[in-house]
Amino acid sequence: MEGRQEDQMNRQEEVEQSNNYDRSVDHARTGRSSWIDNSEINSKWIPQHSLQLEMNNIEGEGSVRENDEEEEEIVVLDPEHPLMKRFQTALKNNFTNQLERLNLDLCEKVVVEKAEAQRRHDLAEEVYMVQEMLARLQASLEVCQETNSEAAAQHRQAEDHLYVVKNQYQDTASQTNVQRLQVLELQSKVDNLALKLLYMQEAKSDLCSDIKAIINASNKAQKERTQTEEQKHQQDIYVERLTNRVEKLLEQISLYDLQLISQTEQTRAAKDSLSEAQLELDSVIVEHRQLLQQWKSSLLMMKRRDEAYTAMQEELRQANDQMLSLDTEIESYKKSITQEEEQNECLTLRLNRGQTDCTTSRKLITHSQNLQEVLQAQLSTYTRILQETENTLSTLHGNLEMHQSALKALRKQMEKVSAVRLDLESQIMNKLQEQLTHNNAAKYSRRMNDKTAVYRREKEAQLIKFENDFNTVTLEGQELATHLDSLLAFQAELEQKSTQRHLLLSSREEEIVKQITDIERKQATISIYNKKIKDIVSSTGHEDLGPLEIHAATLSKELEEVGAKIKECQQLWLWQQGELVRFTQEKQAHSSSVQILQTQLTILQQGKIRRESEMEQDQSELADLDKQIKVLMADMVKLNSLLNKNSDLNHALQQSSNLMETEFRQRLKEAEKDSAETQLKLERLNEEKERLINSLVEAERQVMLWGKRTQLMQETCSAIDSDIGQGDIRTMRAEIHRMEVRYAQLMKQQERLLRDMESVVAKSKTIAVWSEAQARTQAHKQPTHNDYHNTIQSLRRKILQTKKQTEECDGVIAQLEERLGSMTSRLQDKQMHLNNIQNTEAFLSQDLRRLQEIKERNLYRLPVLQTRAKHLHAVKEGRYTPMATGVTALELGTHKQEERLKMVSLTLQRLAQEYPQHHSTLHRMNSILAEHLHGECPNSQ
């Protein structure tokens, strides 16, 4: 029974102890939530016990209060306690081993730091050299920028000077055009006056020749008056025949007068010749009156009329020839128009080809622009990546600031590396800014090159236009020269013919003079013989025909025959004189045309000289522009080389910075891993240490509690009588026995806890050794100086490979640039060809417009001429009634009409200025009115 009771009591105590243990565990969980995981892990090795005893309910409230006070007390063992010596010796050995290991690690780290400091010094020297090179490049770039700015200023000055020269050229061109128009007007006036003067001189010469002929005829008539009286009977019949012939000639003259009037109304030259013919007809009428008195003079005048008639027929023939030549010219114009249309079709085909080439070039340009956009997108992605890297670097800076307390040495190194990185970033930013400035300068130079190319194309187009004008002028000059040669040949032929005619006339005149002298001599002999006959007749009183009389009769007959021959020769001489006059007139006309052509040729030669001077000026300007372009191209080549060098340096710096960043990041990650592992190990060791100390303190407290309780029990036993409370004594003995058993258990537990503490120290030592071994393995894995050297060698190999790749890329870029240059040259050639085609098209369109204007002008003049012909026909038939009678009324009417036409032309000019969209039609109408005004002015005169 007692054994069962003791067992039940032991069970109750164990249950209470387990409940108290659970309460202490809950209190530890609520108090130290951060050590839960480590306590759960370390609970496998370190068992935690908390002993707490309670007195029986029999003992009273005082013993319960004492037990509560004992439970609330926390006993802490002194370090010099004999129980702590074993633990302290183990900890001391552990700490000494750790100190030795840390000293060894510190020596190794000092050596590594020295090597790192040497490497940093070398890297700082390299960075200093790179900075010096960058400064030199910056200075050269500033010099290039200054040269570019100077070149741009010179280019602007050249453009301003060119603009001023263009304005001056336009002003001078407008002035020259106005002066040319004035010269042409004055030349036309001078030509008209010269023609009038020639006509007047010809009329004067004709009148002088007529007067001389009349004087000679009157003298001859006075000499032959005596002879005519004797031969009056024979010539009355001849006079009647002549009167009939004169009447016929008068009828013919009236017909010729009508024809002459119609011809004079058709052309201005015909009008002048008609006025002369009318004057000659008046003189013919006067001479006809004289012919009624003097038949010989009338005969001569009729011969002259015949000559005038032949001259008019010749002029009519010439007019017909001119009409035929105009028809041939019209046909040639039609053929040329068809040829121009074919040429225009060919040009349109070429233009379409050029447009297709332009479309292909535009497609290529769009493709290059797309490539540029893709490259810009890549650049934006690279910038975004750089920003992300900067963000990551900022985050790393934050992490580094968080771990500054634990990693001071790494923090210093990191600060140095970050300073280097900041310097590199500033250098990279400076390089990027320099690259942007280079790009802007390159864009500006490209823009200036494009402007110069456009200006050069314009100048080339102007030069081609000048060459075309020069070629046209040379062709016109050659045509004029050929025409002049033909005219000179024709003039030489005419001169030869005139000389032949003059020789014939001189020979005939000599023969006539000889015959006249013979006739006069014979007449003198006849008169002598007649006197002798008269003397004989007067002496004898009758006529006797002797041989001499018969011979005289025969001689008189011969004289009559000779007189008839003389008359025929005189008629032939007169006809030859008319031919000579006609030839002289043709010669004068040819000489006037030759003079006009010579003046035109001189004008064209002056224009040629002026255009050659302009072309030389343009060529000199083009040479200057070529020189400037070459200088700019050399500057561009230098800038491109500098840009390539800067890009290579930037690329190398970026690669080195990227490599340093990657290495630094790897080292940071490894250091962070090491620091995290060491922190975890330290936290675990601290937790284990605290738990062990707590368990030791609690065990010591339990031992002290049990000592106090045993002392109390002994005192109670001594105080209690032997007689009183034997049952209680038994229970107390049982309790004491239980306490002794419990004490033995606690001593065992204390021994076990001490062993656990020693094992914890040993385990911490093994953990430290294991962590050191792992750190050493990781340290072995980390790169040494040889590894760095190997990595540098591999990086150098990679750099060489990248340099080779960049050289290959440069070669490809050079090939592409050559292809681009060839494409640009081809585009420029095609552009020049297209400009030539456009210039020829514009020139042909101007010619076509001019021909259309001439056609419209002719179509406008045709009904006017038709109405004029109708009016002339009405005048011929006598049905025309004039609007104004008298010179003053006619002048007033013409003046009014001219004023009306001037008002209409002014209104048309104003409308053309107000409505430029209808400028062509209004200008055409205005030109027709101007021609009408210019045509009416000489007619009115």
Swiss-Prot record:
Keyword Metal-binding present in the record's keywords: the answer is no
Q: Which domain of life is it from?
A: Eukaryota
What residue spans carry the region label Disordered? 1-31
Q: Any keyword Ribosomal protein?
A: no
Show the ranges annotated as biased composition (Basic and acidic residues).
1-14
Listed Pfam families: BRE1
Expression sites by tissue: Expressed in tissues that contain motile cilia, including Kupffer's vesicle, the floorplate, the pronephric tubules and the otic vesicle.
UniProt keywords, alphabetically: Cell projection, Ciliopathy, Cilium, Coiled coil, Cytoplasm, Primary ciliary dyskinesia
| Compartment annotation | Cytoplasm; Cell projection, Cilium
Describe the outcome of a gene knockout: Defects are the cause of the lok phenotype, a phenotype related to primary ciliary dyskinesia (PCD). PCD is characterized by curly-tail down phenotype, laterality defects and pronephric cysts, but without defects in sensory cilia and without the presence of hydrocephalus.
Which residue stretches, if any, does this entry annotate as coiled coil?
Answer: 130-154, 210-430, 548-572, 609-765, 814-856, 895-915
Among InterPro entries, the record links this protein to:
CCDC40 (IPR037386)
One GO cellular component, as annotated: extracellular region
Task of the protein: Required for assembly of dynein regulatory complex (DRC) and inner dynein arm (IDA) complexes, which are responsible for ciliary beat regulation, thereby playing a central role in motility in cilia and flagella. Probably acts together with ccdc39 to form a molecular ruler that determines the 96 nanometer (nm) repeat length and arrangements of components in cilia and flagella.
Q: What family classification does the UniProt entry report for this protein? A: Belongs to the CCDC40 family.
| The name this protein goes by in its record | Coiled-coil domain-containing protein 40
